Amino acid sequence: MTAKDVKFRDGARQQIVKGVNVLADAVKVTLGPKGRNVVIERGFGAPVITKDGVSVAKEIELKDRFENMGAQIVKQVASKTADVAGDGTTTATVLAQAIVQEGMKHVAAGMNPMDLKRGIDKAVGAVLDELRKLSRPISTHKEIAQVGAISANSDEAIGKIIADAMEKVGKDGVITVEDGKSLENELDVVEGMQFDRGYVSPYFINDPAKQAAYLDDALILLHDKKISSVRDLLPILEAASKAGKPLLIVAEDVEAEALATLVVNSMRGILKVAAVKAPGFGDRRKAMLEDLAILTGATVISEETGKQLDKATLEDLGSAKRVEVRKDDTIIIDGAGDAARIEARVKSIRVQIDEATSDYDREKLQERVAKLAGGVAVIKVGAVTEVEMKEKKDRVDDALHATRAAVEEGIVPGGGVALLRARAALSDIRGANADQDAGIRIVLRALEAPLRVIAANAGDEPSVVISKVLEGKGNFGYNAATGEYGDLVDAGVVDPTKVTRTALQNAASIASLVLTTDATVAQAPKEESAESAPAPELGY
């Protein structure tokens, strides 16, 4: 077994705190509209320049194993906050550092770490309640754009494009971020349900200029098996022909004989038809076919539903106002499904998302929700260089998450002011003993930290800024972008409540663990053996 180094009490805590400080000091320079850039070396290619706190945190590994423990602990704060709220990673890191530094002074003075932790937990609970009271909901295009702009480091263009995307696909719609091909940001919205399967044969194309098949007021057949015999299809083809409507066939596959008949019918103009393969594989394919069925009002022809293809009728078919089939994808627009059934299906998938254990499953389920709930928006990020593109995409991603969080739980005044105002909740709180009271004071002091860092990064004196902000009330605060004081909500300087809440919760949780640490165990450095030692110089 590998030998271990063990450190106890102050020796253990001091090394961890050093690591906490190294990581936090590197991350906090990015905080606020006047935050600085961090340049990160890559193993190959150009270095990355970023103002994204979690990107900086993820790159840091320290040589000293004990110090590295501290850095990795705080890295967890940033990562967890990013996972839950999508933003606020730098704020969480700054808060964690402040609580650790204040707490260590009290531990060094001989106070009980467990009582300090109880005091911290009590104070954080009160502050979270106060943040909920300060929070207000957002809904307008302007408010959503403001939140997006703040999270993208005061880039109004990013805020506007995110607000436009949300307006078009709804707050539950999928918004994806891709590399653009021009210098400008672009928004591309796919309305209706899109899946990544195109026509089985190019002979179904009825618009050669666009290389696509367009079916208006179409009937839709859904089948979970291969269609090999044309005899099985005849009843449906005849029914569609009599109804005078085009037909879209979605099946596992359409084999040669059946495909040839469909192509001939289509080319002769007897029946406007197109066939595509069903999306997904295995159980996911069954689920997606069921989604399509609910969206279009169809019944999936399968053994599980007790339906046979050769006995299918018009009642088993779904319909949509328009279907667009291209080489690689199919879009079904304005399906005839029942709105209540679609809503129930969305709720059912959301339950599965909450229970999903893998990120991949969760992502696929979220895609299904978005397709049912309303379209997909693609933000194409434009930039001059690859380095700028990477940095800009990180900011768009942050802003997107923050905007979703704001729509979910509302907004509070930004720039660290909400945390400063929430300190009012601590004025009447007392712990069970003096050590718990000290824990409450630790949080009271730490809540100033984000505003201090924002002011320092903007080149102002933090103590003067805090004093001035405390003279005002409510939304009155310091706008670091302009260097002026005023109503931050009116100025568009806002933070999502969920981001601020998550940052404080995670910071306090991790900081409390550091304060209550009494021993650390790390792998001992390997001693160089005599064989691997460098040869002595012989002097000639």
Swiss-Prot record:
InterPro entries: Chaperonin_Cpn60_CS, Cpn60/GroEL, Cpn60/GroEL/TCP-1, GroEL-like_apical_dom_sf, GROEL-like_equatorial_sf, TCP-1-like_intermed_sf. This is Chaperonin GroEL 3. The gene is groEL3. Together with its co-chaperonin GroES, plays an essential role in assisting protein folding. The GroEL-GroES system forms a nano-cage that allows encapsulation of the non-native substrate proteins and provides a physical environment optimized to promote and accelerate protein folding. Keywords: ATP-binding, Chaperone, Cytoplasm, Isomerase, Nucleotide-binding. One of its GO terms (cellular component) is cytoplasm. GO terms for molecular function: ATP binding; ATP-dependent protein folding chaperone; isomerase activity; unfolded protein binding. The keyword ATP-binding applies. It comes from Burkholderia cenocepacia (strain HI2424).
